[in-house]
C-alpha cells in the first residue's frame, strides 16, 4: 500500500513499529506536509506517556517520510536509530 492511496483517517489507525528493535512507537497522530509541493514530509507519533501512563507526553516523535519502509494493512514499519 502506498501513501498515494491512503487517507489520513486510515493512517491514524496504524501502529508504527521500528524495524531496528521491534519497538512499538505508537499510532500516527499528525503529519507534516510541504506547502509548496503538497507532499508528505513526515509523520508524527506521540512521545512516551508520563507518570505511569496517566499523562500525555509533551514530546512528539517526528519521523521523516524517507524513514518509512512499508505501510501495511495494520502497521507502518520505520527504520530509525533512536
Model-derived segments and their meaning:
Residues 1-82:
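Peripheral interaction segments used for macromolecular assembly
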Amino acid at each position: 500500500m502506498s501513501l498515494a492511496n491512503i487517507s489520513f483517517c486510515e493512517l491514524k489507525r496504524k501502529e508504527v513499529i521500528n524495524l531496528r528493535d521491534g519497538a512499538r512507537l505508537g499510532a500516527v497522530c499528525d503529519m507534516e506536509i510541504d506547502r509548496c509541493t503538497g507532499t508528505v514530509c513526515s509523520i508524527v507519533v506521540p512521545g512516551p506517556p508520563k507518570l505511569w501512563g496517566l499523562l500525555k507526553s509533551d514530546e512528539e516523535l517526528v519521523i521523516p517520510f524517507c524513514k518509512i519502509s512499508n505501510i501495511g494493512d495494520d502497521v507502518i514499519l520505520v527504520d530509525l536509530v533512536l
